[in-house]
Structures are given as structure tokens and as C-alpha cells.
Design a protein with these regions (language model features):
Chain A
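Histidine-anchored nucleotide/phosphate-binding helix
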Residues: 237-249
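Short, surface-exposed secondary-structure boundary micro-motifs
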Residues: 67-70, 107-109, 161, 212
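Short, conserved phosphate/pyrophosphate- and ester-handling motifs at nucleotide-, phospho-/glycolipid
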Residues: 153, 234, 337
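Ferredoxin-reductase
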Residues: 115-205, 224, 262-263, 290-294
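Reductase modules of NAD(P)H-dependent flavoproteins
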Residues: 2-96, 101-102, 259-364
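A short, basic/flexible loop-to-alpha-helix module at the beginning of a structural domain
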Residues: 211-222
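Fe-S ferredoxin-like electron-transfer domains
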Residues: 81, 88-141
Length: 364, 111
């Protein structure tokens, strides 16, 4: 066990509820934490607008400070913890759990006097309907014991029993109120969760789910054209956004420019859904497929379900297919591995899109 | 200077000190290799578009020409003194520059 602060001494994890006081110059808020519950999840449950992005130890956004021997570090080697100053008691809210009643100093820019209406919650959920939809890619459904009201583009943190940390998965569906959440997962070498999903064994053990979370969301009253640049399973949250945009008939008035990338053509999935969407407003919707390996594509004979196939990385294909001013005034959603995100971000910034109009989750 | 012609950030080592250099219009800028926010290595996360440098980690931005912060940035970049002489970039790296990564406004907070 590693404890934030200067001194590391053996400590016993709390077996009962603890009271954590989040504080800074804007105020003090007391929150009750379940044993072993992360400070972030406890604070968000309470409605605090704490800083976070991935919620899973990767991005390092949720840095706060604790006093020595008060907080257990649930994942000492978290990538997001690499730059923490342990001497000053810095910890990640998403990877810290209170060992006893304690105080947590959060960044001064967080207004602790405000409480959010949208409060994520913790559920014991059931995993259902696993379907392999492409090599090393599967979809699955998580059934919650009660309905939730997610915003399109949001994600849930999930953890099967026996797995140490939570992982973030974006919903692919959108319903204003639902107890059935649909997800997509890529097989990861050595991955505990994906190993279970792809094992073919019955998934009868409940899993822990926490959400909905995430700020890379779509407001159905938005009146901008949409730009979606995605790779592989990074398409998940974008499918939810497209579902809601379709439901409010966004594309009868606004355009969609989308490039979906995979290494090989057989690795694509959700093509029926995308082709169906493209047919609803062909004058306004462009959806292209980008294949980064294999033979050059781009001629219409290589079209798949009416979606044009092009050779190259997502950002290259987006650049070559976009007309001057294509991205002006648009709202962009990105999803995929970090190198793809960076390349697409560079493309959109070069095109003059402000960062405030580019949304994505930093899961990796 | 030719190495900076293609734009973007270029990594150099000067007297054992790693720096990143970039050229925007007629201005050459030399900075420490880390983002002042959370020490992200800018050679990987830094994106130059026009005069703007963006760290893709948390989308902090700076104008490299004016040295002003943009958007979400809360701390300024710091620059090594440098000048161009006969097509070569000279950098004053007599002292390694680094950022203070602590939350200054938290340091005087009474727990």
C-alpha cells in the first residue's frame, strides 16, 4: 500500500464510512465515502464539480492534496500519477480512497459552493448480450438496477469483480432514460475485462458500474455542423451522439463530416448503422472509411454499404476530402488512440477550429 | 535555422540542457521541453498551428509570437534567450529554465 504524503507507514484501509471534507478558498463540503471508494466518485455522487477527464488514473486531471497517512493510493503506478509531488501530499482524486476522516484540498478554481444537478451513481450491474462484431472487437450491454439519464457522448466506469481498477467505456446508444447501456470493447492483450468478454464463458457475476460521466457531450439544441473523426473502438461515444442528433433531426439542417478509421477493411463495425444514417440526409451527411493498411482504396468499387473507402490515416483522409472552409464554425468530436487524436487535433487547429469546439475523452 | 523551416517543435540539446525550438514568422522561440501545467513532454503533446502552441494533454495554449496565454492556459511559457546569427540559432543555456509546478494559490491556504 502506498500512502500519499511524506511518510509511508502501514495503515489499515477504512472498513466503515469515512467523512471527507473537500475544501479550498471557496468553501468546505463534507462528503461521506464508502470504504475503498475513490474520492472522485464520492465527490461527484455528492454533486461537487470536481476536475476530471478519464476518471480512471490515466489523464492526471484530478490532482488534489491530502495530509500524510490519510489517503490510500489505489493505483500507485497510474500513468496520470507520474508527475505528482508526493512531498506536498498530491494525489489523484480518482485513485485515492480515504483511510480515515480527512480533508482534501482541491484546486482553487473549483467552486465548492456549486452542486451539479447531474450526479453519477454507483451500481451493481449485469453484463449481457456479448457479440463479436469484428476481429478483437465486441459489443455488450450492461443492465442497471434502475434507470439513468445520460447525456449523449458520456461514459461509465466499470470494474468486474476481481479487477483492481475501473476502466472507462463510452455508451454507443442514446436514450434519455434507460437501464440498458450498450458498449463496444477492443480486446487488449492481458486485459482483465476484455479477457472476460472474449472468453466466451458465462458472464453471470455482477460488475460495478459508476456513471454517467464525461464532458465530451452533445447538446441537442446545438445548431452547428458536426465533424466526427474516429478510429476503431473510439467510435463508441460518437455513435451515441449521432443517435441523439438523428433523433432531433439535426442533419436536416446541419451537416456531418465523418471519417471512421481502421487498419483493415474487415475491422470495421457499425457500418449498417452508419450507412443507414447516411441515407437519411445524403445532401448533408458525408461518412468516409479510412483504411491505414493494405492496398490503396478510394475508387467507388471499394465502397462498403455505400460508404466510400480511402487509404490512409483518419487525419490524412479528412484533410484530403475536406473542402476549404469545411470545418469552419463546426463542432468536432474525436475518438481513438492518442496518436490519432493528436493528428486530428492538429488538423482541426490548423483549420482554425478553436479548442473549445473540439471535444474528446482522454482515456489513454 | 534550416531545421526550423518545416514548422513545429524541434528538440535540441545545448550544453546538456534539452530545449525545444520553433519559428513563427520572424520570431524564433526556445522553451523548456515540458508543459508548464503538468510537465507533459511537449515534443509529443505540443501542436503548433500558426502562432499557437497547444498542449494536447489538457488543451492549454499560448501564442508563440506574443508570448501570451490563450484559452485554458493558466501559466505562461518561459523562454530561453536566443538570437539568429548568420543563419544559425544561438541559445543562452547558461542556466536551465524550469517551471514551478505547485499551485501557487494553494500554498498559503490554511488547512
Amino acid at each position: 500500500m502506498v500512502v500519499s504524503g511524506e511518510i509511508e507507514t502501514p495503515v489499515v484501509p477504512a472498513s466503515t464510512m469515512t467523512q471527507v471534507t473537500f475544501l479550498n478558498k471557496t468553501g468546505r463540503v463534507d462528503v461521506l465515502c464508502e470504504p475503498g471508494e475513490s474520492l472522485l466518485q464520492a465527490g461527484l455522487r455528492h454533486g461537487l464539480e470536481l476536475p476530471y477527464a478519464c476518471g480512471a488514473g490515466v489523464c492526471g486531471t484530478c490532482v488534489a492534496r491530502s495530509k500524510p497517512n490519510t489517503v490510500e493510493n489505489l493505483w500507485p503506478n497510474a500513468p496520470g500519477a507520474a508527475q505528482l509531488n508526493a512531498g506536498k501530499g498530491e494525489c489523484l482524486l480518482c485513485q485515492g480512497a480515504a483511510l480515515k476522516d480527512c480533508e482534501i484540498l482541491v484546486p482553487a478554481k473549483i467552486d465548492l459552493s456549486r452542486l451539479s444537478d447531474q450526479r453519477p451513481a454507483r451500481f451493481e450491474a449485469n453484463l449481457q448480450d456479448v457479440k463479436v462484431v469484428a476481429p478483437d472487437v465486441a459489443t455488450f450491454t450492461v443492465r442497471l438496477p434502475e434507470t439513468v439519464r445520460p447525456i449523449s457522448g458520456q461514459y461509465f466506469l466499470m470494474r468486474p469483480k476481481g479487477m483492481q481498477g475501473f476502466r472507462a467505456y463510452s455508451m454507443t446508444n442514446f436514450d434519455e432514460s434507460t437501464d440498458a447501456l450498450h458498449f463496444v470493447i477492443k480486446k487488449v492483450a492481458g486485459g482483465v475485462f476484455s479477457g472476460k468478454i472474449f472468453s466466451g464463458e458465462p458472464l453471470d457475476e455482477p460488475l460495478e458500474a459508476f456513471g454517467p460521466m464525461g464532458l465530451a457531450t452533445f447538446d441537442p439544441s446545438d445548431t452547428r455542423d458536426l465533424i466526427c473523426l474516429v478510429g476503431g473502438s473510439g467510435i463508441a461515444g460518437i455513435m451515441s451522439i449521432l443517435a441523439q442528433a438523428r433523433r432531433v433531426d439535426h442533419f436536416s439542417r446541419h451537416r456531418l463530416f465523418m471519417v471512421f478509421g481502421a487498419r483493415r477493411i474487415e475491422e470495421f463495425f457499425f457500418l449498417d448503422e452508419l450507412a443507414d444514417l447516411a441515407r437519411t440526409h445524403p445532401d448533408h451527411i458525408q461518412i468516409h472509411l479510412a483504411v491505414s493498411e493494405g492496398e490503396a482504396a478510394g475508387d467507388t468499387s471499394k465502397d462498403v454499404r455505400g460508404l466510400s473507402v480511402h487509404h490512409g490515416f483518419v487525419h490524412d483522409v479528412a484533410k484530403s476530402l475536406s473542402r476549404p472552409g469545411e470545418f469552419d464554425g463546426g463542432l468536432a468530436f474525436l475518438g481513438g488512440p492518442p496518436p490519432m487524436l493528436n493528428s486530428c487535433l492538429a488538423l482541426l487547429l490548423e483549420a482554425g477550429l478553436p479548442v473549445s469546439d473540439i471535444r474528446y475523452d482522454r482515456f489513454a | 535555422m534550416d531545421e526550423l523551416a518545416g514548422g513545429g517543435l524541434k528538440r535540441f540539446e545545448v550544453a546538456g540542457i534539452v530545449v525545444l525550438a520553433t519559428r513563427v514568422n520572424d520570431t524564433t522561440r526556445v522553451i523548456p521541453p515540458f508543459c508548464p501545467h503538468m510537465a507533459e513532454p511537449l515534443i509529443e503533446s505540443g501542436i503548433c498551428s500558426g502562432a499557437t502552441l497547444t498542449c494536447s494533454k489538457h488543451l492549454w495554449q499560448w501564442n508563440l509570437e506574443s508570448a501570451e496565454m490563450q484559452g485554458a492556459a493558466e501559466k505562461p511559457l518561459i523562454f530561453y534567450p536566443s538570437e539568429e546569427r548568420d543563419g544559425e540559432l544561438w541559445i543562452d543555456a547558461s542556466q536551465e529554465l524550469s517551471y514551478q509546478f505547485d499551485e501557487e494559490d494553494d500554498d498559503d491556504f490554511e488547512w
